[in-house]
Design a protein with these regions (language model features):
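Conserved binding/recognition cores within well-folded domains
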Residues: 7-112, 116-118
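Alpha-helical DNA-recognition elements
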Residues: 126
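Tandem repeat protein-protein interaction scaffolds
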Residues: 129-130
Length: 131
């Protein structure tokens, strides 16, 4: 019953987010995450990078102002965040519009705020095509 209720909750979150977006142009869509005992609403526009932590079911969410560690998979985060985000390697997703520079020779991107992320060969080819 646990997995089913989580799936239903996620779908409801998406439905409510779509309703919010369509009813008010000035409301920025948010993603709701749980970090320990806290429930946090993060504006999606503020999320720069989401990085998986090796050998754990945790991810670090880097926003324009803070880092939040939550128990979640990268795949689920990408699903929640939508098409503005993309994988740059198997353990990291970024918000595409916040990529400030791509270094094709050394395979990394510099994000808004100066955060540097590694880009895999495969993802580099996709990113360069999209830019």
């Amino acid at each position: 019953a646990g997995k089913m209720s989580i799936r239903i909750e996620r779908r409801l979150d998406r439905v409510f987010r779509k309703i919010e977006e369509s009813t008010s142009g000035d409301i920025h869509p948010t993603v709701r995450v749980e970090s320990g005992s806290r429930i946090i609403e993060i504006p999606i526009k503020d999320i720069v990078v989401v990085q998986a932590i090796k050998s754990s079911h945790l991810v670090d969410i880097y926003t324009t102002s803070q880092k939040i560690r939550i128990k979640e998979t990268l795949k689920n985060m990408l699903e929640k965040l939508g098409e503005e985000f993309t994988y740059v390697n198997k353990s990291c997703i970024v918000q595409k519009r916040l990529i400030r520079e791509i270094n094709k020779k050394n395979y990394f991107a510099i994000m808004s705020g100066g955060l540097q992320v590694e880009i895999s060969y495969r993802e580099m080819r996709k990113l360069v095509k999209e830019q």
